[in-house]
Amino acid sequence: MAQENPKMHNSEMSKRLGAEWKLLSEAEKRPFIDEAKRLRASHMKEYPDYKYRP
């Protein structure tokens, strides 16, 4: 989406992607959810003392 619309503001892109995500079925979302869990576990293992500090 960013490559197709290089001048689109990030907030607009987030809205559109969020709308597309809501249209996906649970089965379509599952690979992304599973990958996020895998990456979260990997990050926690690699950086056990990490604390998010905005």
From Swiss-Prot:
Keywords: DNA-binding, Nucleus. One of its GO terms (biological process) is developmental process. SUPFAM superfamilies: HMG-box. Residues 1-54 bind DNA. GO terms for cellular component: nucleus. It is found in: Nucleus. It comes from the Eukaryota. Pfam families: HMG_box. The keyword Repeat does not apply. One of its GO terms (molecular function) is DNA binding. This is SRY-related protein CH2.
